[in-house]
Amino acid sequence: MAPSKQYSEGGQLQLMDAERIEEEEECFESIDKLISQGINSGDVKKLQDAGIYTCNGLMMHTKKSLTGIKGLSEAKVDKICEAAEKLLSQGFITGSDLLIKRKSVVRITTGSQALDKLLGGGIETLCITEAFGEFRSGKTQLAHTLCVSTQLPIHMHGGNGKVAYIDTEGTFRPERIVPIAERFGMDANAVLDNIIYARAYTYEHQYNLLLGLAAKMAEEPFRLLIVDSVIALFRVDFSGRGELAERQQKLAQMLSRLTKIAEEFNVAVYITNQVIADPGGGMFITDLKKPAGGHVLAHAATIRLMLRKGKGEQRVCKIFDAPNLPEGEAVFQVTSGGIMDAKD
């Protein structure tokens, strides 16, 4: 079927392809479908009040956490989980089946062909991509560009979806979106209307925002979640070695939530991270810095990108860790129109 217009008169994003809509409907099962399996509608409402809107999301919770929901006994939880299992395939599958499932992955262009090539096509859905580096290394500029490119149709290497942006440092600028949208030939106001934004002030606020996001993602076609930066509030709210263990535990819980969102709704999760001094880096290493967050963040992020400054407005991206990408570097440039290929 031929693609339809991307935006309605009201500026809201329209899904471009009818076949794509059918694919998206198969990505997750609504929690309301439990009613057809004999679950009381009141119990389904309790799950929704707790931030659980899909059967996929339900199966990502332990029974212990589900019994913590007011009004749900162990017997009810067992019955609910049994009903959800009937709607989903949660067991082993073959590698061939997984390969077919991986075809649902969408790769969103960064705006730079060189960077896209390095990333195997762009920022992937179904996983967390972390970008770390010093200030002015291009992390937030890449985030702004992705806010626009995500809304491009699939055939233009976009995500054909909306964007959720959690800002912990107050660096998001809507006026920055305007020239980037113009570069891609898109209506700036319509693009901004399809970005939902929240400013987080504590790590608890940051986590609660993620819980509330599930309701929106279950109802609307989101394709990207940005957290800029993921570690900033944890470094402020927890200080000293005495609170390090608790900080890492809370950070792990939040990263687990991000992973579940990525897999539950087939969205790309792009997080930025700060760097800290690495006194044990060695005497032959000139740049003694490493990403903050320790092993907890290192294991949670599927793809880790190290950004650094180059000449002038040029930036260099290096694959720091990725399960499916070879080591390599790409040079890109920060312009008024966002991230682009570097000019010699």
From Swiss-Prot:
Keywords: ATP-binding, Cell cycle, DNA-binding, Meiosis, Nucleotide-binding, Nucleus. SUPFAM superfamilies: P-loop containing nucleoside triphosphate hydrolases (SSF52540), Rad51 N-terminal domain-like (SSF47794). CDD domains: DMC1. Expressed in pollen mother cells and root tips. Pfam families: Rad51. The keyword ATP-binding applies. Its main location: nucleus. ATP binds at residues 133-140. One of its GO terms (molecular function) is double-stranded DNA binding. InterPro entries: Dmc1, DNA_recomb/repair_Rad51_C, DNA_recomb/repair_RecA-like, DNA_repair_Rad51/TF_NusA_a-hlx, P-loop_NTPase, RecA_ATP-bd, RecA_monomer-monomer_interface. SsDNA binds at residues 235, 238, 241, 247, 315. It is found in: Nucleus. It comes from the Eukaryota. The keyword Hydrolase does not apply. One of its GO terms (biological process) is mitotic recombination. DsDNA binds at residues 235, 241, 247. GO terms for cellular component: condensed nuclear chromosome. Belongs to the RecA family. DMC1 subfamily. Plant silencing DMC1A are sterile due to defects in homologous pairing and subsequent chromosome segregation during male meiosis. Recombinase that may participate in meiotic recombination, specifically in homologous strand assimilation, which is required for the resolution of meiotic double-strand breaks. Exhibits DNA-dependent ATPase activity when bound to single-stranded DNA (ssDNA). Mediates renaturation of homologous complementary strands as well as assimilation of single strands into homologous supercoiled duplexes leading to D-loop formation. Binds circular single-stranded DNA (ssDNA) and circular double-stranded DNA (dsDNA) in vitro. Catalyzes DNA homologous renaturation and DNA strand exchange. This is Meiotic recombination protein DMC1 homolog A.
